[in-house]
Amino acid sequence: MKCVLVATEGAEVLFYWTDEEFAESLRLKLQQSEDEEEELPVLEDQLSTLLAPVIISSMTMLEKLSDTYTCFSTENDNHLYVLHLFGEYLFVAINGDHSESEGDLRRKLCVLKYLFEVHFGLVTVDGQLIRKELRPPDLEERARVWKHFQRLLGTYSYLRDREQSFAVEAVERLIHPQLCEQSIETLERHVVQAINASPERGGEEVLHAFLLVHCKLLAFYSGHGASTLRPADLLALILLVQDLQPSPGTTEEEEEEEDSDSPQRRPKSSQNIPVQQARSQSTSVPTRSSRETDTDSISLPEEYFTPAPSPGDQSSGSLVWLDGGTPPSDALQMAEDTPEGLASHSPELPSPRRIFLDANIKENYCPLVPHTMYCLPLWPGINMVLLTKSPSTPLALILYQLLDGFSLLEKKLKEGQEAGSALRSQPFVADLRQKMDKFIKNRVGQEIQNTWLEFKSKAFSRSEPGSSWELLQVCGKLKRQLCVIYRLSFLVTAPSRGGPHLPQHLQDRAQKLMKERLLDWKDFLLVKSRRNVTMVSYLEDFPGLVHFIYVDRTTGQMVAPSLSPNEKMSSELGKGPLAAFVKAKVWALVRLARRYLQKGCTTLLFQEGDFRCSYFLWFENDMGYKLQMIEVPVLSDDSVPIGVLGGDYYRKLLRYYSKSHPSEPVRCYELLTLHLSVIPTDLLVQQASQLARRLGEASRVTLP
């Protein structure tokens, strides 16, 4: 019983996503109120009819009172509604089976908004343009766009419920230093440098290349001048890869799950996402640029082996555990794991995709820079990803700076800044005028030239300056025209619409070479990804420890032992119910820790039945010395959720803490642990400190 909707203030649907149960419930409700002989409207219109009163009342309250409701429950607590306004449009999430909390629903809405930004870039700044992208006039094109985001939302929901990396929103790495180093060298010499040296690349330049095994990062390489990818962007890329090339489950498991009667089903709006097995977690992301060849790694006490050649292609206080927590993982079921669902994914090579990620251009930060992503499948579950930039990338920086300048000007005018000499004296206004004059000089569009002349006559006239209201109107027109240029430059020319991209033979060559290099490791990698980090090596030093998740929030990387609540996938906790029970405890601990961190609590200790749960957040300097703790900001219930996909909370937290430590770099860490309840609290805290120190020291070890 789940639904997500994006609508205008007039209740026009721009996007929707429902599961089968919600759609059926809505159909039955409308059948009772409509004449049985009349044909029911399409689902889009049904949702508009259902939610129009909510949407219109919410927007009216906002207009009249400058405030509105953001969450409510229906009678008898049957349905939970969460509303979040982004720009001009209202995002609504509904849950009717009590499987998601207010925080879960709000996080889902923020992730959806982030996915819109990744796909449309700065076009999302303009309400009219993003409306045309999300709701094209052509019905077939609209269905294609909606299906794409429905599938992405379904994939995200699945990964969030199954993958520890998506639960805590941090990148996990497959830990094998030897293979990691070999793979990085191959990416550097035979992929990135080889493609960039080819005269046939058509102006495209490979910036980043990385290897994924399921959701784990095996190796990552960045070329000359490439910016560091944010953890949120890397997680988004992993999500896109899992959507394009979903990791297959076993046929037996799919049959068993199809026959189950689990109440929680994945919505059929994303039917082409096959089953994925639970996967284990890892540690720091290995990266190496052409400027710096050292690769970060974690050296954990594990045994590694080189596989024999493949025989061939066949080869703070006591708290009460909240009711209604995360259900056991074995209750999760994929409704689309059917032959029809599996067949809907074509085995052909995915086409290049235009995406927008944060980057630095000419040493200037620029959000939502256009890139082209190439997902090159090596084997089921193993993929190579390339990210390229085009020669027109510098235009993105210019457009962002102009849009940012006009947005700041709008803010000043709305705050009561009068037009005239006071406005002209603002330093950013002179800089904006200079950049815009230079930009207009190199553009041939008559419309934007005329609008700019109109703006200058109103903003910089000493005799008859325009009013603030007039300047706001012209500012809005200029921003829209800049967004139109952005759209024509980067969306209309996207590879999926016939725009420039790497020649197919260069992609094929890189794909073939990487397959040859990894052929002898293929089976090992697939097994290793399921059992990446084990608890065995920790039990002797940390008796009573059941599970942990360690996160370096500065780099957005994490390490955790594997959790496999799957009947077919054995783990140290055995099969089925026990592993599922522990997983449910861990997921509930993650949610509870976020809730208390939102209220300013950085330490959490409590007992629930046979387990003691703990959560710690702390800061260190680059030498690994713990820094004095401060009070972290308290956030409202309707604020952007804690995490990195929906909003970069930890980057803001680091910036906030660094104000009190301006002379040294600051790092942020989190540790979540699950112990047996026989372990005393003081010993638990001691173990947590020792575990954090051990993992922290390992994370600073580099490969030879």
Swiss-Prot record:
Keywords: Albinism, Guanine-nucleotide releasing factor, Repeat. This is BLOC-3 complex member HPS1. Changing residue 31 to R: In strain: BALB/c. GO terms for biological process: blood coagulation; cell morphogenesis; eye pigmentation; gene expression; inflammatory response; intracellular transport; intracellular zinc ion homeostasis; lipid homeostasis. It comes from Mus musculus. It is linked to Defects in Hps1 are the cause of the pale ear (ep) mutant which exhibits hypopigmentation associated with defects of multiple cytoplasmic organelles, including melanosomes, lysosomes, and granular elements of platelets. Expressed in all tissues examined with the possible exception of skeletal muscle. The highest expression was observed in lung, liver, kidney and spleen. It holds the Pfam family Fuz_longin_3. Component of the biogenesis of lysosome-related organelles complex-3 (or BLOC-3), a heterodimer of HPS1 and HPS4. HPS1 cannot but BLOC-3 complex (heterodimer of HPS1 and HPS4) can interact with the GTP-bound form of RAB9A and RAB9B. HPS1 and BLOC-3 complex do not interact with the GDP-bound form of RAB9A and RAB9B. GO terms for cellular component: BLOC-3 complex; cytoplasm; cytoplasmic vesicle.
